[in-house]
């Protein structure tokens, strides 16, 4: 059996990142956590006699040499009023790397073992302190990279998803109660009125939750934005402008960027993974050729493409090929750069021509910042279509596990409706209803297995 389920063990882990900092938090829990920790605290009797939810100042001591390891503040919790439902100690110490190692070594020396990833949260779940939807929300909250994802995780942590699943489950059980009447009493089938509206409502609620999953995945993965174009048109300048920092080398020499550069930024609460790619051109340089191949591959996979054109120069053959290939692609915005310079008449006339005027374009100058607000407005228009739909949903599903179970429950509901149309016997309908309820119970953790829990919590970070 996995050590995750050895609930009687006293466990310890660093709950904050392992790097030098002003403070760190070392978390411990277990049936003997307070007694064991007291042997390494400067005033053991104070801890042993203390009530829960109290804070104590003192020192971590080597219980053999009495050497002081660190000056600490200790938060003490007594079962069952703690996150794990067990006695727990949280130590706030100085964030010295050597100090952290020495303190944890002493925890191990007095009988604690290192916690497995997610073990504290698992113990909280097993103690009935939270359901699986809240446990997963904690993990989502920790890993959130943008305000939108963070807000969605907080919403689920407050119990919104559990409440929604519980409501659907109660509706389905009400349907079961209604058809149970016909199981208990003989009734003329012609007089039977099955409350199909209850099942249709549940079907609609499940559809809505399942639909929200695609939006959630897009929010978590972010927008893949590729900056493409010929050499020396200002892609790297635009890259730096979007990031608001100098990440890419800007040079008047063509071919400065020979491979892509990747970075991330947040815009209106949405994560953008932006790629500054090698300029598209014919070249004999093998390394640059590889960079161009990668550029073309990124373009094909991109969510959004900014094709940068130099309005002060002539359009290249590569520009014309790209425009012809992507002129009807809604992912592409043609960014007409360098409007601060004397413009090339042929290039300007090309984009003003009737054949090409329908192209999605915006004029900017990365040097003077002309048109940048217009560019930002175009970005907002793009993300409004697929990435700002969270307002359409009261709850958004982002867990692959939850989405898979919701799809199973939905398939069972469809099957149930089909059997109702076929006038299948009530006892068979009751069996199907119980199956739906069990699947919904797997989402919240009311029905689950050790294997499922082990697989889920191993993806948590240490100390959580």
From Swiss-Prot:
Sample GO molecular function, one term: metal ion binding
Cofactor: K(+)
Binding-site list for K(+): 251
Residues annotated as domain TrmE-type G: 222-384
Amino-acid positions noted as binding GTP in the UniProt annotation, renumbered to this chain: 232-237, 251-257, 276-279
Pfam families listed in its UniProt record: MMR_HSR1, MnmE_helical, TrmE_N
Keyword annotations of the record: Cytoplasm, GTP-binding, Hydrolase, Magnesium, Metal-binding, Nucleotide-binding, Potassium, tRNA processing
Cofactor comment: Binds 1 potassium ion per subunit.
UniProt-annotated binding residues for (6S)-5-formyl-5,6,7,8-tetrahydrofolate: 27, 90, 129, 464
PROSITE patterns associated with the record: G_TRME
Function, in words: Exhibits a very high intrinsic GTPase hydrolysis rate. Involved in the addition of a carboxymethylaminomethyl (cmnm) group at the wobble position (U34) of certain tRNAs, forming tRNA-cmnm(5)s(2)U34.
Protein name (record): tRNA modification GTPase MnmE
């Amino acid at each position: 059996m996995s050590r995750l389920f050895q609930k009687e063990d006293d466990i310890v882990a660093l709950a904050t990142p392992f790097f030098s900092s002003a403070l760190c938090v070392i978390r411990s829990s277990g049936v003997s956590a307070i007694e064991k920790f007291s042997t390494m605290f400067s005033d053991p009797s104070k801890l042993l006699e203390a009530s829960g939810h109290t804070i104590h100042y003192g020192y971590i001591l080597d219980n053999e040499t009495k050497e002081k390891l660190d000056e600490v503040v200790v938060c003490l919790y007594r079962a069952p009023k703690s996150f794990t439902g067990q006695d727990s100690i949280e130590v706030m110490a100085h964030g010295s790397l050597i100090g952290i190692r020495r303190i944890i070594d002493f925890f191990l020396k007095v009988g604690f073992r290192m916690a497995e990833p997610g073990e504290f949260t698992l113990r909280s779940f097993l103690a009935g302190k939270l359901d699986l939807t809240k446990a997963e929300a904690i993990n989502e909250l920790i890993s959130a990279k943008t305000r939108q994802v963070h807000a969605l995780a907080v919403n689920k942590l407050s119990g919104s998803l559990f409440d929604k699943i519980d409501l659907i489950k109660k509706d389905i059980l009400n349907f079961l109660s209604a058809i149970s009447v016909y199981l208990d009493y003989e009734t003329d089938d012609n007089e039977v009125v099955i409350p199909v509206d209850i099942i249709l409502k549940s079907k609609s609620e499940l559809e809505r939750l399942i639909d929200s999953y695609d939006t959630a995945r897009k929010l978590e993965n972010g927008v893949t934005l590729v900056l493409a174009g010929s050499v020396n048109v200002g892609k790297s300048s635009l890259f730096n402008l979007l990031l608001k920092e100098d990440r890419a080398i800007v040079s008047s020499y063509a071919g400065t960027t020979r491979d892509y550069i990747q970075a991330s930024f947040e815009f209106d609460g949405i994560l953008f993974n932006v790629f500054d790619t090698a300029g598209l051109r014919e070249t004999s340089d093998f390394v640059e050729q590889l960079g161009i191949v990668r550029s073309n591959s990124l373009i094909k996979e991109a969510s959004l493409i900014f094709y940068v054109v130099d309005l002060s120069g002539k359009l290249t053959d590569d520009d014309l090929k790209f425009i012809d290939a992507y002129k009807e692609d809604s992912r592409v915005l043609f960014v007409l750069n360098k409007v601060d310079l004397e413009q090339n008449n042929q290039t300007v006339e090309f984009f003003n021509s009737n054949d090409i005027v329908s192209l999605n374009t915006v004029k900017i100058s990365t040097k003077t910042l002309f048109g940048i607000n217009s560019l930002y407005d175009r970005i907002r228009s793009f993300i409004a279509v697929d990435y700002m739909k969270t307002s359409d949903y009261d709850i958004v599903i982002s867990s692959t596990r939850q989405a898979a179970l919701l799809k199973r429950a939905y398939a069972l509901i469809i099957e149930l409706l089909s059997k109702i149309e076929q006038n299948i016997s009530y006892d068979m309908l009751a069996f199907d209803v119980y199956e739906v309820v069990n699947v919904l119970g797997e989402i919240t953790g009311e029905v689950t297995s050790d294997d499922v829990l082990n697989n889920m919590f191993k993806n948590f970070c240490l100390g959580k």
